[in-house]
Amino acid sequence: MTDFQFSKVEDAIEAIRQGKIILVTDDEDRENEGDFICAAEFATPENINFMATYGKGLICTPISTEIAKKLNFHPMVAVNQDNHETAFTVSVDHIDTGTGISAFERSITAMKIVDDNAKATDFRCPGHMFPLIAKDGGVLVRNGHTEATVDLARLAGLKHAGLCCEIMADDGTMMTMPDLQKFAVEHNMPFITIQQLQEYRRKHDSLVKQISVVKMPTKYGEFMAHSFVEVISGKEHVALVKGDLTDGEQVLARIHSECLTGDAFGSQRCDCGQQFAAAMTQIEQEGRGVILYLRQEGRGIGLINKLRAYELQDKGMDTVEANVALGFKEDEREYYIGAQMFQQLGVKSIRLLTNNPAKIEGLKEQGLNIVAREPIIVEPNKNDIDYLKVKQIKMGHMFNF
């Protein structure tokens, strides 16, 4: 269906809030399957029967870690060998059920799981409902239907649990595109992707919090250092602020990814240290601005992997080829945390100090107003000239050499 458009995440959340079933698909390079999803509070016999009739897959009950602990739902196996590490617990039935398999009795079990008064002794195992424990952090940590189900229930203001069921085609194989799209249209069912849900959360969830503010005298001048911590990962970042950023005027700003070798060791294999110095100097001269120092070593692959990439570069690969050879994308960085840091600092619009078009696009996607790009001008040396040319040719970096 070439003219098909996925639903808005807001519409999917509202449908979940109203007790409806929606369709959610994951990535093509993962399961590439669609699941029916609804909230556990609306695990009615009708919804379960619909999933069993049209989905024909295993009806599971994704739950938060808190619910699993409260009800003492233990992992199904000691060693999880599932291809995607789906976190099955022991299967359960509520003690008020008979066989537990009918749509009506599975409804009882699912709804009792989210009952405020539920306790571990209310359930027996094995049973006919299959709880799955969602990762803390949801789809931003694991892009599975388990996490999507719990995230959607939470975003809808409901208990952090739901139902999900894989969808099989009439021939018994898993239904994929475009048949999933056709089904959604025929049943007037909201249909979103997990990627959409990830993007929605990055834009709307509060994913970073400010911890402290302290004076930071530097060789460039005096700045204020604002410390931040990511809510999900605990990763720490710093904003170096000069002057008042909250007056509504556009702010000279830079996102600088941590580079221990360039920033601290003075390595000439990259231009990171020079870019940091140039940005600090320019902001000091202007008397107002901010540098976000993000812990994204090696374009997001980490220090050790960056050094491993250097080894491959010494054997003839370029910086992009080396990252890919190690199993990474050419650039693993994302900028939604940086965008939220800008927002918490009161920054409304920026003149972005960068040569990297991906930073511009990444911040714009988060709704940040970038009024201009200010180039970072550094002189290449014999050790980094080839590296910079590769970034220019393969990654679109905007250099003037």
From Swiss-Prot:
Region DHBP synthase, annotated ranges: 1-203
A Pfam family: GTP_cyclohydro2
Pathway stated in the Swiss-Prot or TrEMBL entry: Cofactor biosynthesis; riboflavin biosynthesis; 2-hydroxy-3-oxobutyl phosphate from D-ribulose 5-phosphate: step 1/1; Cofactor biosynthesis; riboflavin biosynthesis; 5-amino-6-(D-ribitylamino)uracil from GTP: step 1/4
GO molecular function annotations of the record: 3,4-dihydroxy-2-butanone-4-phosphate synthase activity; GTP binding; GTP cyclohydrolase II activity; magnesium ion binding; manganese ion binding; zinc ion binding
Which InterPro entries does this entry report, sorted A to Z? DHBP_synth_RibB-like_a/b_dom, DHBP_synthase_RibB, GTP_cyclohydro_II, RibA, RibA-like_sf, Riboflavin_synth_RibBA
Q: Where does Mg(2+) 2 bind?
A: 31, 145
How are cofactors bound according to the entry's free-text note?
Answer: Binds 2 divalent metal cations per subunit. Magnesium or manganese. Binds 1 zinc ion per subunit.
Names of the cofactor(s): Mg(2+); Mn(2+); Zn(2+)
The UniProt annotation puts the region (GTP cyclohydrolase II) at: 204-401
Output the GO biological process annotations, alphabetical, semicolon-separated. Answer: riboflavin biosynthetic process
Which residues does this entry assign to the site Essential for DHBP synthase activity?
128, 166
- The residues the record assigns to binding D-ribulose 5-phosphate are 30-31, 35, 142-146, 166
Keyword annotations from UniProtKB, A to Z = GTP-binding, Hydrolase, Lyase, Magnesium, Manganese, Metal-binding, Multifunctional enzyme, Nucleotide-binding, Riboflavin biosynthesis, Zinc
The positions annotated for binding Mg(2+) 1 are: 31
Q: Which SUPFAM superfamilies match?
A: RibA-like (SSF142695), YrdC/RibB (SSF55821)
Q: Which GO terms describe its cellular component?
A: cytosol
Which residues of the sequence carry a binding annotation for GTP? 254-258, 275, 297-299, 319, 354, 359
Q: What is its EC number?
A: 4.1.99.12, 3.5.4.25
What does the record give as the function of this protein? Catalyzes the conversion of D-ribulose 5-phosphate to formate and 3,4-dihydroxy-2-butanone 4-phosphate.
Q: Which PANTHER family match?
A: 3,4-DIHYDROXY-2-BUTANONE 4-PHOSPHATE SYNTHASE, GTP CYCLOHYDROLASE II-RELATED
Instruction: Give the UniProt family note.
Output: In the N-terminal section; belongs to the DHBP synthase family. In the C-terminal section; belongs to the GTP cyclohydrolase II family.
Give the protein name, as stated in the record.
Riboflavin biosynthesis protein RibBA
Organism of provenance: Actinobacillus pleuropneumoniae serotype 3 (strain JL03)
